[in-house]
Amino acid sequence: CGGKGTSGGKDASADKGSVYYLNFKPEADAQWQELAKIYEEETGVKVTVVTAASGQYETTLKSEMGKSECPTLFQVNGPVGLASWKDYCADLSDTEVYKQLTSEDFALKDGDKVAGIGYVIESYGIICNKKLLAEAGYSMDDIKNFADLKKVAEDITARRDELGFDAFTSAGMDGSSDWRYKTHLANLPVYYEYQADGINNTKAIKGTYLDNYRQIWDLYINNSTTDPKQLSVKTGDDAVAEFVAGKAVFYQNGTWAYSDISSVGDENLGMLPIYIGVDGEENQGLCTGTENYWCVNAKASEADIKATEDFMAWLATDDTALKAICGSQGAMPSGADGMGFVTPFKKNLESDNLLVNIASQYVADGKTPVSWNFTTMPSETWKNEVGSALTVYASDQTDANWDLVKKAFVEGWATESQAAGN
């Protein structure tokens, strides 16, 4: 894309450079468009925001980087994403946005170079409708490990006709939802294997905890609103609709889903860790981390790089920008809802997202957050193969079909790591 050098000889606005942000989060598109306009009005610097469709970010980024007007601000998901794009990542170690981080842990490093800046910290687990749980005769305090969760879920299933609801929302394996299982749920066996082996990355996963992965997947799909054979066509929106309508008690998702489900009422919402039956999991918290790192395109013009770094600094420090990013209801200048993110920046605002505050409470209570190790999964192909195998298994739950999940997980990891040169 565009070459190095200044934009001398162009009109005054060109000298300021411009920003092209390729946004990863479709659910925040409207807010980013509004912030871009505000920044442009304040500074005269043009900011273009393009949002990739769900699950299409890498494909879109590759396509856009091949154009003459390519993104100046893009994102990677962590070490694996960085490996593909490190030649495009400018060093951000001297930038204001880097200085605004509360911890080095939120910077993505490539040797000594700061290649990416984490801009949102998120947590996920099992979101719970406490009102329905109480109607079934239980409270959150009754669920401290996998055995407890299984007992409660199976009891709800046994009484579903009497209760009028199910234990879990549909575990949709359509492209809008399958990431919750092939990536987020799959993080748990990876996390526990890394913990057991004292590592934070590997070219060859052993699959030590895949029996645990199977038992939580079995629990999800056999105690839900939907016949497991129908999961391939179930969407993320289906799961939201089921949860909001009070058709299920439990819904695996994260803090980012708050605005989708807030109509259930804060007093009725809780969040549980994803228990998979590992010793000591009573001390486990939610899965907390980031796979959202901002990177600045090193191949953009100097003026555009400077403009982009200035835009990032504004996002991390400006009151209006931070309110839009951290706030929820009515937080945008237009009166629309904000993004509801937690940022790792010094000026982060306290959230009015209940799920974020629940995540913070787990930490305050001394529970150990589960780190996001799915950023070390070797490729999208690996995730897709695991997802396909999970879907096949759901429709016919045989040991032979689970062996296909194990094969995709273990052999697929080695194959994809080798292919990526990781």
Question: Model features per residue range: what roles?
Answer:
Residues D91-D105, F168, G172-G175, V190-Q215, ...:
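Short, solvent-exposed loop/beta-turn-alpha elements that line the ligand-binding surface or hinge
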Residues A115-Y119, Y124, K150-T202, A248:
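Extracytoplasmic/periplasmic solute-binding protein
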Residues G118, N353-A414:
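C-terminal capping/gating helix-and-loop segments adjacent to ligand/active sites or protein-protein/ligand interfaces
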Residues E64, P71-T72, Y98-L133, G164-D166, ...:
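A structural signal for short loop-to-beta-strand junctions that line the ligand-binding cleft
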Residues A153-E154, I199-V233:
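Glycine-centered hinge/linker elements that transmit conformational signals in sensory
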